[in-house]
Structures are given as structure tokens and as C-alpha cells.
């Protein structure tokens, strides 16, 4: 455990040093030498964000996808007063439809072979942020941050090759306690707790996971608003496929109601970019619950950026 946190600190220090080095690259007068400088440091950063590096050197693994999407456009804003949302006293403050979206997500193993062979206990953390980077009138605030710590027990079936779901063998089963909140106070505070179950099936380049959950009672969302599951759903279905150097994935949530059906759809495509250490990343999302502040507000969003570390 100590080694894992030490590794995380070392990783952050290392990435910061690379950032300073890349800034120095911009001072090189020769275009060819300047490009070579950028390439060398981007390759090093990619290595340090690579899944094997996380696992073998730092004891940390990517959990969900890690990405930065500088161009993220959504079609409509929610009903919150921008002055309240940004804690601003200015009368002409508004929410921009164009913003930056980013997500960091990692998993830190704590114990292995604790109860059964090939089982593990780990801590995971995911943070998704929506930054009004281009909103000068509001001083470029973060519109929303969603914090999601998770404690996971997982049983891996590393030798199982028997097809169960669409000829895909069961590779793991997990039970986790998940807390999700936006870290705000007073009327903008939103958060909920769930007991989650996750079955993951995989073969070759295809991965499918089914994650239903039980919502804990008396959380901030259910206390303040009724029928939360109408918007956030009861499960999440993830599908990922790797083709050559391209990654395709989808995430679906739904309330499974014929009357008043609501849900969420997310489609992702990661593609290689020549001479750049990261993959390009396109994301389209539609529906409810992309963030807690928007969980009752239907949003359509198209984003473009880079993938730092993927689910595979």
C-alpha cells in the first residue's frame, strides 16, 4: 500500500517535470529540433501512463479511461443559476456551451489472494471534471467535478475459457462500495452511495461488462429528489472492442421503464496519431446523468481530445 502511494507521488512529480521540459522545447529555434524535443517527451509520458508501467513499476493500474477533451460542446445548459453555480456576483455571467472535459481514473491493489485464489481487494478513484476554460466572463471556473472513490473485491477467473455470454467467457466478478459526489455544499451538494456488482466477459479483442447496483438509502440525491433511479438507471452495460490500434467502446445506462424511459449513452473512439504519444479521442454522449449537476437534465455532447490511458 505504501509503495503504491509513493509510486503515485513519483508519477505526479515525473509528469510535472516532463511538463516543464516540454515548455522548454518551445524555446528551441530550429523547427526540426523543436519537433524532435516534443516527440521525445511525449513518448516518455506515454510510457509512464502505460498500463504495464502503472502495474509493474508503481503498483497502480488505469481503471476507467483517462482523457483530456479540450473541445467539448453540449447543446443545452441546466436550470441552475450561473451566479449560484460559479459563486459569482456578476450579473452578466453565463454558462458556455463549449468547455473542457477531463477524466482521471486509477486503481490501487491493496490485497491479493485474500479469501480465494486470484481474488483481490483494491481502491479505485475516478474524477470527471467540466472546466469552463473559455468562459472569460466567469473567470474560467470548473462548472462541475464528480468524485468517485470505490472499494472493490474482485475474483478473477484467469483460466476460464468456457463461453457464457455471446461465447465470451467470464473473466471476473466484483462487488464494490461506490460513493459518488460533487463535493459542493448547501443546495448544490449532490451525492449517493451504491453497492455495485460487476460481471466482466472477454475474449481476444472484445470485452463486455454488466454492472447493476443497489442504491443505499438516505443519500443526498434520494433525500432531496424522489425517483432518482428514473434518471440514473439501475445498471451500466459496457462494451469495448480493440481493432488494430483503434479502440471502440460504449456505455449504456437505463431505467428499464416503458413509461417515462430515460437513460444514458456514451460512444468512444480512440485512434492513433502519427508522431504523437497519445491516441486521439472522440466521445459522444446523450442522456441523463453525465454529471451529478446534470443528472435530471438531458444533455447531448460531442467532444474531441486525447486518450491518456484506456480501459485495455
Question: What spans do the regions from the language model cover?
Answer:
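N-terminal signal peptide c-region/cleavage motif recognized by signal peptidases
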Residues: 14-17
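Outer-membrane pore/translocation modules
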Residues: 81-89, 111-242, 252-254, 288, ...
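Outer-membrane beta-barrel initiation region
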Residues: 35-141, 145-149, 159
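Alpha-helical, heptad-rich or low-complexity scaffold/stalk segments
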Residues: 19-43
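Outer-membrane beta-barrel "beta-signal"
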Residues: 148, 299-312
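Residue-level detector of the transmembrane beta-barrel scaffold of outer-membrane proteins
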Residues: 61-74, 120-124, 172-176, 207-211, ...
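Sec-dependent signal peptide recognition
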Residues: 2-10
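Long, repeat-rich segments with strong aromatic
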Residues: 234-288, 310
Amino acid at each position: 500500500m505504501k509503495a503504491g502511494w509513493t509510486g503515485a507521488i513519483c508519477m505526479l512529480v515525473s509528469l510535472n517535470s516532463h511538463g516543464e521540459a516540454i515548455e522548454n522545447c518551445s524555446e528551441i529555434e530550429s523547427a526540426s529540433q523543436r519537433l524532435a524535443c516534443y516527440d521525445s517527451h511525449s513518448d516518455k509520458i506515454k510510457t509512464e501512463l502505460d498500463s504495464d508501467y502503472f502495474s509493474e513499476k508503481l503498483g497502480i493500474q488505469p481503471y476507467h479511461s483517462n482523457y483530456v477533451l479540450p473541445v467539448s460542446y453540449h447543446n443545452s445548459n441546466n436550470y441552475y443559476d450561473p451566479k449560484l453555480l460559479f459563486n459569482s456576483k456578476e450579473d452578466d455571467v453565463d454558462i458556455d456551451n463549449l468547455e473542457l472535459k477531463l477524466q482521471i481514473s486509477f486503481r490501487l491493489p491493496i490485497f491479493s489472494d485474500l479469501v480465494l485464489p486470484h481474488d483481490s481487494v483494491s481502491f479505485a478513484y475516478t474524477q470527471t471534471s467540466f472546466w469552463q476554460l473559455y468562459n472569460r466572463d466567469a473567470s474560467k471556473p470548473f462548472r462541475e467535478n464528480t468524485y468517485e472513490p470505490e472499494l472493490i473485491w474482485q475474483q478473477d477467473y484467469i483460466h476460464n475459457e468456457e463461453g457464457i455470454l455471446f461465447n465470451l467467457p467470464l473473466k471476473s466478478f466484483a462487488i464494490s462500495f461506490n460513493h459518488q459526489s460533487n463535493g459542493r455544499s448547501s443546495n448544490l451538494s449532490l451525492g449517493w452511495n451504491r453497492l455495485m456488482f460487476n460481471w466482466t466477459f472477454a475474449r481476444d479483442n472484445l470485452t463486455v461488462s454488466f454492472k447493476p447496483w443497489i442504491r443505499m438509502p438516505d443519500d443526498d440525491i434520494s433525500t432531496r429528489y424522489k425517483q432518482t433511479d428514473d434518471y440514473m438507471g439501475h445498471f451500466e452495460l459496457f462494451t469495448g472492442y480493440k481493432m488494430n490500434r483503434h479502440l471502440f467502446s460504449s456505455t449504456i445506462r437505463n431505467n428499464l421503464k416503458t413509461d417515462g424511459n430515460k437513460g444514458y449513452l456514451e460512444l468512444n473512439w480512440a485512434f492513433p496519431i502519427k508522431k504523437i504519444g497519445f491516441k486521439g479521442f472522440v466521445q459522444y454522449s446523450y442522456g441523463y446523468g453525465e454529471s451529478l449537476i446534470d443528472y435530471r437534465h438531458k444533455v447531448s455532447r460531442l467532444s474531441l481530445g486525447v486518450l491518456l490511458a484506456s480501459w485495455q
